[in-house]
Amino acid sequence: MSVSFENKETNRGVLTFTISQDQIKPELDRVFKSVKKSLNVPGFRKGHLPRPIFDKKFGEESLYQDVMNALLPNAYEAAVKEAGLEVVAQPKIDVTSMEKGQDWVIAAEVVTKPEVKLGDYKNLEVSVDVEKEVTDADVEERIERERNNLAELVIKEAAAENGDTVVIDFVGSIDGVEFDGGKGENFSLGLGSGQFIPGFEDQLVGHSAGETVDVIVTFPEDYQAEDLAGKEAKFVTTIHEVKAKEVPALDDELAKDIDEEVETLADLKEKYRKELAAAKEEAYKDAVEGAAIDTAVENAEIVELPEEMIHEEVHRSVNEFLGNLQRQGINPDMYFQITGTTQEDLHNQYQAEAESRTKTNLVIEAVAKAEGFDASEEEIQKEVEQLAADYNMEVAQVQNLLSADMLKHDITIKKAVELITSTATVK
């Protein structure tokens, strides 16, 4: 294989390489054997057409595209490796020569990984705004949240207050004309929950069961239903019931209802204190890691970040987001309709995040390279076993999904992150 690379501009160039006749000839034979099985040529049994007759009738060149499709991926990968390039986007392929009996010549326009000039990344001083200490208020807030989850709604005679739930019928109209989606019966609405249009819930506060209230609101300018956006509407609202939240007493019985593993309220408080301490410690470590990596990225200089890298990261993020929606049973088209957005809006939303993540990945990879980090066979095996345990998969499944190079890359990245983080100190 002949390989050459010509720089055209920063992070861009043309990789020219050949596919030899030693590779082409056996692949031509293989493709011919496959093609002739379906050929019906008068005078010959199906699948038994001799090669010379095929070449005369159809031309050897008719096989070239299939041969190229089969050989190109591996040939391109080998050329990239031989040229010592780190390519970061799909190439633009131009087949410059496919002469019969000659080596084929391919020119690929490629985008290469940008140069990263590292600044300080060890022994950094960082600031974090995360408290590690667990206070009594933290414990009480957790218990109060669980206590409220066990609360019951009890009908009350008094007027509705914020925090109460009202059961209502409502009919909405604009200029006296009812509109689609503006009617409901026996609807349970938490006052102060923000479920309805701003101002709706506030106008029910102070009213009692049996009352009918004319609620006047204006739809927001950015309301998802464009025909209603910015318009004033009247909702004739009848209150059937007003319910107040009744929370259980704060005692040992409550503690046992919240967590069957404890006997007393004191036990529950102690358990929550330990859990909160562990969670805060983890949050603190994450904050230190994030601050240290952000500082290392700020200290580095990346020579012209290619747009293609950002686009690929945006594409990956959007696909991940839409995939998560579908796993929740939400069709992407439905999501765009409900939110009044488009796929282009979603791409724009991820643009800044993708640029930041791409820079971060490049700097961490540069640190791993500068430190000469590698991964042993033992470390790779341990990583495979850990992933299998994390995702409840067989070890063989993980090995089939992830190549050794991918696993090695992940391990060296973890080592770089650990180095940056472990040597950092908090101001």
Swiss-Prot record:
Domain comment (free text): Consists of 3 domains; the N-terminus binds the ribosome, the middle domain has PPIase activity, while the C-terminus has intrinsic chaperone activity on its own.
Record keyword DNA-binding present: no
Cellular component terms per the entry's GO annotation: cytoplasm
PANTHER family for this protein: TRIGGER FACTOR CHAPERONE AND PEPTIDYL-PROLYL CIS/TRANS ISOMERASE, TRIGGER FACTOR-LIKE PROTEIN TIG, CHLOROPLASTIC
Molecular function via GO: peptidyl-prolyl cis-trans isomerase activity; protein folding chaperone; ribosome binding
NCBIfam families noted in UniProt: tig
InterPro entries, A to Z: PPIase_dom_sf (IPR046357), PPIase_FKBP_dom (IPR001179), Trig_fac (IPR005215), Trigger_fac_C (IPR008880), Trigger_fac_C_sf (IPR037041), Trigger_fac_ribosome-bd_bac (IPR008881), Trigger_fac_ribosome-bd_sf (IPR036611), Trigger_fact/SurA_dom_sf (IPR027304)
Main location: cytoplasm
Keywords: Cell cycle, Cell division, Chaperone, Cytoplasm, Isomerase, Rotamase
One Pfam family matching this protein: Trigger_N
PROSITE patterns in alphabetical order: FKBP_PPIASE
Family under the similarity heading: Belongs to the FKBP-type PPIase family. Tig subfamily.
Record's function text: Involved in protein export. Acts as a chaperone by maintaining the newly synthesized protein in an open conformation. Functions as a peptidyl-prolyl cis-trans isomerase.
PPIase FKBP-type domain residues: 163-248
Record-listed E.C. numbers: 5.2.1.8
Protein name per Swiss-Prot or TrEMBL: Trigger factor
Keyword Cell cycle in annotation: yes
GO terms of biological process kind: 'de novo' cotranslational protein folding; cell division; chaperone-mediated protein folding; protein transport; protein unfolding
Compartments reported by the entry: Cytoplasm
Top-tier EC class: isomerase
Catalytic activity: [protein]-peptidylproline (omega=180) = [protein]-peptidylproline (omega=0)
